[in-house]
């Protein structure tokens, strides 16, 4: 059902007991571990649930090796979980678009080219408060975390020299770019959250995907029109 209708009833009836469904239908898709319920963490927990703790690492390694054979290039010294995270944050969306012929069932909300914040929302779980929840439970807390890390890096830069200072400045500058991008995204997200947008599955992905301005990735590829920019 659209609008997340019936989901609570399914859970109450005992659905998803073995592996609980995500409680808000918002899955952060990040290149680093900023949230404990991001897509990478959920995949890890799914593998643990299905195959057990004793086989967790070998299965993660199998997944990572498969991804390096067919989707992404291997990276020396990278852990299996980091390889999976890299695939998810750089290639999953492209593969999903291709698989569903530009009519995705998971929608990618994206702050922009710096990827300060990205998340997937399953279209059947979306409802008119999803954007407000995305903002209050993910975007606003992430802004605070970015700022705290920038402040910490500034302090470290003051006490560093040479190559270490250069590295710290680079990390700080990259994080500052993400912070600024996320702040702009937050302004736009607040605007659309206040509108409490509903979708009608009968209208199809093409129509519904175009209701969110430039909050979503690849709007023109999916709808045929450039996104409305605030």
PLM features: residue spans?
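Terminal accessory regions of large proteins
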Residues: 1-230
